[in-house]
Structure formats: C-alpha cells, structure tokens
C-alpha cells in the first residue's frame, strides 16, 4: 500500500498541485513566483552562490532528463566502465558545487540582515527542501555507486509508466530507502513550486 501511495499517488498529486496552484497563483498574484529581489541588498555572496547553484543544478537536472528521454542511448553510454566512472565523478562534483552554492545562498538569507528582512517563510521552506534534495542526491552518489547506470533500469521505467498513466511502483520497491526518499522528494519539490 505504501509503495502505491509513494510512487503512484504522490507523483500525480504533486503535478496536480503544481498545475492548479500555478494557475491560481497566476490569476491571483502574478508576482508570487519569485522571492523578493535581494540583489541590491548584498551582491557578492549572491553572485558566488547563485552561479554555483544554478550551473551545478542545471547540469545535474539535465543529466537526469537526458537519461529519462534518451534512455537507450544513456544505457549504451554508461555501459562502458570508463564513461560510467567519468560521469559519476562529474555528477558528484557538480552536485557538490550546487550544494555549496545553495548553502551560501541560505547563509546569505539568514545572516545578512537586509536580505533576511525580505525573506519569507516560504523562501526558507523551499531552500531547505532544495538543500535536502541535493544532499540526498550526494548521499546516493556516495553510498550507492553507479547510479548513472541503475537509474535507467529502475527510475526511468517508473517515470515512463507515470507519463503513460499506468503507474508501476514495482520498479521502485527494491531500491534503498534513501533513493525512494529522493524520488518522492523530487515530486514534493514540484508541488512546492
């Protein structure tokens, strides 16, 4: 039952919340999609945190999406141990860069008084959720090696089943709890946005 809730109900519920909430926010308050700008309040930490965070996370998310969309090509790519090791090292390095950038952005929001004054509770909730998700990804990369390879055979078929409106949670059942938490956390982030 829990697997059905986690891997068949929560993903659809998260997407529904994101779509309906997005429409509602657009109609009621179009400017609520972003935290208040703090660029003029303190920009040095913003630059280093923002650049590290955005470059790191966009490349990590890009790899997740490429493996999802081009799964056969990705499986072929990571079938060679040298390419697999290279992708794993690059992915871990990028996730560490993203995490450090996000940590800098969170610290800036908490420490710089003028920035803290324009920080809403929802800003902090989202930043903590993002940091948790990236930390889980790093934990998986360090503790459950070769994720670039097994992702294609577990999470990708599960995500494809969701898109086809025929959820197959059995693909996720045998994965470690931390991987399951990372997968569900991704959909919770979708709902938060």
Question: Language-model segments: what does each one mean?
Answer:
Residues 1-35:
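Perimembrane topogenic segments of multi-pass inner/organellar membrane proteins
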């Amino acid at each position: 039952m829990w697997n059905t809730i986690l891997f068949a109900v929560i993903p659809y519920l998260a997407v529904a919340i994101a779509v309906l909430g997005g429409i509602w926010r657009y109609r009621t308050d179009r400017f609520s999609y972003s935290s208040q700008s703090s660029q003029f309040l303190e920009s040095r930490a913003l630059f280093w945190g923002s650049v590290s965070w955005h470059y790191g996370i966009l490349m990590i998310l890009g790899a997740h999406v490429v493996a999802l969309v081009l799964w056969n090509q990705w499986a072929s790519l990571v079938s060679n141990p040298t390419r697999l090791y290279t992708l794993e090292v690059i992915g871990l390095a990028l996730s560490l860069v993203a995490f450090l950038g996000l940590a800098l952005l969170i610290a800036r929001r908490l420490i710089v008084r003028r920035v803290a004054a324009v920080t809403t509770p929802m800003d902090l909730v989202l930043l903590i959720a993002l940091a948790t998700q990236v930390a889980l990804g790093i934990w998986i990369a360090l503790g459950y090696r070769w994720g670039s390879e097994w992702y294609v055979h577990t999470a990708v078929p599960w995500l494809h089943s969701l898109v086809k409106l025929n959820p197959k949670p059995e693909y996720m059942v045998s994965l470690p709890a931390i991987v399951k938490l990372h997968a569900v956390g991704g959909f919770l982030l979708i709902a938060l946005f």
